[in-house]
Amino acid sequence: MIEIRPWGTYEVLLDKPDHKVKEIYLKPNHRFSLQYHEHREEHWVIVEGSGTITQDDGEGTISPGEYAYIPRGTLHRLCGGENGIKLIEVQRGICDEDDIVRIEDDYGRLEK
């Protein structure tokens, strides 16, 4: 089932007790929250489009065929480029959708 979010869509391809695989589409010039996860790590493989990735204090461009590793506790964000970006995300650990600590959010989803 495809889940719709303000930034784009995702579909869970595999959901196991200790890992999850998603296909994610981030709309052009939209971005994830600046966030970190306490209980999981993420691995991103870019399959279409390009974007800007932020990890802790660094920022760079990421394109098809490139890979990013986001360790647990790492502050991160992805922004879709002018054509958006599609990626496969592999989560390892406790893969609960509530394990998101948002620092900044363009869509008003910061917890008060």
Kindly give the residue locations of the regions a language model identified.
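Glycine- and acidic-residue-biased ligand/ion/polar-headgroup-sensing regions
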Residues: 39-52, 56-57
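A generic "binding-loop/recognition-motif" signal
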Residues: 30, 39-40, 58, 74, ...
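Short beta-strand segments
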Residues: 22, 32, 58-62, 99-101
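Short, surface-exposed charged micro-motifs
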Residues: 23, 43, 52, 67, ...
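A short glycine-rich, His/Asp/Glu-containing loop-to-beta-strand
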Residues: 1-36, 40-41, 90
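Double-stranded beta-helix
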Residues: 1-5, 77-112
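Well-ordered beta-strand positions
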Residues: 14, 25, 35, 45, ...
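Short acidic-glycine-tyrosine-enriched beta hairpin
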Residues: 56-75
